[in-house]
Amino acid sequence: MKKFLPAILWSTLYFSISNASLASLPPNNQLVEDQSTGFSVQPGFEVDLVYKVDNSKYGSWIAMAFDHKGRLVVSDQDKAGTFIIDLPPVGETLQESMIKKLPLESSWRGMLFAFDHLYMCAQNRVVRVPVSPEGEFGEMEKLFDQGPGGEHGPHSLIVTEDGKGLYLVAGNFSKNPPFEKSRIRTNWKDDVLLENYAYGHNGNGKAPGGWVLKFNPDGTERELINMGYRNPVDFALNRDGEMFVYDADMEWDIGAPWYRPTRVNHGVSGGENGWRATSKKWRKYFPDSVGSVVDIGPGCPTGVIAGTKAIFPTFYRDALYLCDWTFATLYSLHLKPQGSSYKAETRTFLTNTKGSLSLTDIDIGKDGHMYFCVGGRRQQSYLYRVRYVGSNTTVLSNLDTTSVHAQARKARHMLESYHGKENPDAVEAAWPYLKSSDHHLRYAARIALEWQN
């Protein structure tokens, strides 16, 4: 049987864990105006307009990804196409000759270079294209079909924490994911004691809602990891290898007791976040809901990226970055361990107080600068670059592997290893954690027990 720390230990330590996580962050500086763009940005950063897109030729960009040579691939939302760009150095102008159209159709929602391929998802399928060391693209291969979902369908792809597979996130219009295995018992029901208030937008929507799927690089062994989101357009892993999902609100619910603001969820194994149509939504305090690490408020989540590869100050390299399409804001998300999970604080990293800034996607270039694109729904598109020009150290912080927080996460991972299958050791290992003061340890233990007969 796997070794595990007694649950009573975590109950004893939880108070100190929670208090330790309240340590203050560095001061939240007042934003300054960027002289080039007029945007408001954190001190020490400058913003460059790299390219104002000719929409008649290149469309309105909604997805982007960097290849191993530092080239940027972007996709129009409609039929203009998919393009590859040789970005010029800082201070030089992007010429139209640097933009080339790829034979890859259009309207890709998410793109990722990994495992010597370009992976892409659209509203009805996931595909990959081989990419040679010289940067040449081969023939497109469909990995699997996924039912149509439009702007609430399959969205984004990332590499798994062990570097061996991929995750796909999708919104609540997607059909049930084509999985062969699941970390969640697939016995979800929509029965209720009292009739629900039904209205308007997706009024008949049912579980599982939005979800995260794991699969091998060749598209096989698809496994449902977590679910219950509304419309999470993007997600990312932090430096601990933990998943965080940026989920949307339902703006028609504002003012209702079942309103759930845009928020960031910890995408744990077996996680159920309880999105249901209209008044059926689970509240975050329900014991069988994972809950959020931070609630943000009204907005429209789009791109997410970890700052790890950016040449940014240490504090910002540890952050995640969240794009809000509606409110012209790029947030930095600062995670602090709390038991076996986290809590978080969001700060405005960049915004445009003088006009629109419909952020659609974001990535870190090979040069260590941050790039984001603006567009969507046939709006005028732009490509911007964010550079750090200050004097603070940009060295990565040391990973925490020994604190009570790290040990609590290790205990949760042990419990999660029993998800999705029967194991004769599971009951003895998980049962003591049902009385833990740590919600996420209790949650992981319950899911482990639900899989045992």
Give the residues covered by each predicted segment:
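Bacterial N-terminal signal peptides
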Residues: 6-19
